[in-house]
Amino acid sequence: MKCSEISLSIIMPVYNEQENIMFAIEQTMLECRNFKKAELIVINDGSNDDTNKKLIDLSIKYPNLIVLKNHRNIGIAKSLRYGFLKVLNDYVLFNSADLPLDPKEICNIIEQKFPFDLLVLERKGYSNLSNWRIFVSVFNRIVLHIFFPLALIDIADCNYTFIIKKDLLQKAFPNAISSNFIETEIILRAKYLNADVKTIETKYNRRKLSRKHFGRMRNIMYSLKDLISFRLHSILIILGIKKQ
């Protein structure tokens, strides 16, 4: 199926992204033209710089740009869940303002692997990342495959991004509060629902401006808490004691 026959919602949580936001939205909107219908939902997560002002200006230029605002910083995971509840189109993707996924790749990726219920994007490499970031990413992969060996046997990278059917997202809606586990939880829930899950390797664009919070000890602890909680939940699902 061609992108011109597909409707897509793109979610983008942002926090103090005044340096990135205009370029990110301009590039994303160019790619949106390739789709039958597309919307970009930006969640301003309590920014205290000029991010909100720039978003307001951009929303005048782009009618399919929806700006949501958190009055305080609540984190990526909660912002994503907020955005997921607002999507209108058939497929859903999330990206960051620093564009780790180049918007120009979106249509090509979808057409390569269509049809699917969930398409997991896996990073080709970790070039130019710090040793700490590489260690955390590799350690995270190992831990996930220890806790969920069968469900993740064919998935190497659960912490980049994905493209998912809206109907499946509603059934696999996450409870995670950690940005490091929310995507993994959705993937696992989709697997337990026997969804058609595919993977594709894509180029990862390293962040150039501002800072990312992935790899901070507090976020790692939240991630472990989410992981253990969902592992217990998944055992009950497998045993038939609890539903999704």
Located regions from the model:
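Acceptor/aglycone-binding surface of glycosyltransferases and processive sugar-polymer synthases
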Residues: 70-86, 91-94, 103-180, 207-215, ...
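Short loop->beta transition adjacent to catalytic acidic/histidine clusters or analogous donor-positioning motifs
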Residues: 6-8, 29-41, 50, 63-66
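Conserved donor nucleotide-binding strand/loop of the catalytic core
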Residues: 38, 52-86
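Short, well-formed alpha-helical segments that are part of the catalytic scaffolds
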Residues: 17-31
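Donor nucleotide-sugar binding loop of glycosyltransferases
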Residues: 17-20, 47, 76, 102
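A conserved acidic beta->alpha catalytic loop
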Residues: 44-53, 99
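Acidic helix N-cap motif at the loop->helix transition within catalytic regions
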Residues: 19-23, 49-58
